[in-house]
């Protein structure tokens, strides 16, 4: 084990023990955004006059982000260290102690759906493929062999990208069914109906069981294996097509970030655009996001059509929903909670509803983000489509997404497009 590995492991342990809530930094004068909504930070920080808590960083140490990307020697070692970025006593049911952030921003952040690891759900059958163990991390293999002997009853250590995808899809459906300005405490029945679609039960249309089943049959992903952004997007597309009553179309580009309007309209509706979720799997660099894409990536969260960004390294996927300056705010799926009993006709208790939301802020500097990600947009109608195209074409810096009127033909092996230089790389799950 080299010195770099030891240093990274030590840093990860420190991050787990010292996990201060981010402060509304005085040197960042920009507003904070949450999925297209802007919140000014110049309001009084504490109407009651109480002082904000001091940072918990260790003296003499630089700020450590809650989920700094690691450079580990193997996926097994990384999985073994994949502890939640939030200590157990700081889960979603605890209100934020910070008085520095605009209350309206915190209310909006808390109203976003947050899916995490769950345990004690109906077993997901194991694959009978003899090569399956080779695709699993060491911790998952051990748990499968000694604990979940009859199938997976928890997704700890392998389901974080699925949970991030569920969060993205649920918040898109929330905008359609509850409204963008919906906040917790209202429309409880409708909120419970939406959550029932994602229950950890094979009968629920967007359950982890359905994701795993489709991933195994169409994406080559074994039960217990970590999903990548591309496989997650394909699962969302297939499961949404099966669940007709959600009235949501899905347009997926897993081989790049080019959007072709003729293809999009075939899916969204040739006679008028109906609500359509656009999912783009991209890779914006090698080890980190290339700086030329920073501004375009920040702008994506500010678009009113944005439903967030899901992605990260294996065993470390996050769901990004906010931005301020160079920092991205995210929901962390790496917490294991008991599965909620599934009953589509019943209302969840306040305690169970609390486990799908958090007011606890977490953020990551853009330079620490992994370049592989799944970007989501919700286009509700023709006006939304026109506004989205206008915003994309006026972006500052290198654009991430390009829109074309027609699908372009495949280019020959020895032909090269002029604009192919410095282009966003298509995302392949196996590249991680």
Swiss-Prot record:
Segments of this protein annotated with the region Disordered: 74-97
Entry EC no(s): 3.4.22.-
Reactions performed catalytically: [protein]-C-terminal L-amino acid-glycyl-phosphatidylethanolamide + H2O = [protein]-C-terminal L-amino acid-glycine + a 1,2-diacyl-sn-glycero-3-phosphoethanolamine
GO biological process, one term: mitophagy
Keywords linked to the UniProt accession: Autophagy, Cytoplasm, Hydrolase, Nucleus, Protease, Protein transport, Thiol protease, Transport
Coiled-coil ranges (or none): none
Subcellular locations according to the entry: Cytoplasm; Nucleus; Preautophagosomal structure
Family: Belongs to the peptidase C54 family.
Role according to the record: Cysteine protease that plays a key role in cytoplasm to vacuole transport (Cvt) and autophagy by mediating both proteolytic activation and delipidation of ATG8. Required for selective autophagic degradation of the nucleus (nucleophagy) as well as for mitophagy which contributes to regulate mitochondrial quantity and quality by eliminating the mitochondria to a basal level to fulfill cellular energy requirements and preventing excess ROS production. The protease activity is required for proteolytic activation of ATG8: cleaves the C-terminal amino acid of ATG8 to reveal a C-terminal glycine.
Protein name: Probable cysteine protease ATG4
Organism annotation: Coccidioides immitis (strain RS) (Valley fever fungus)
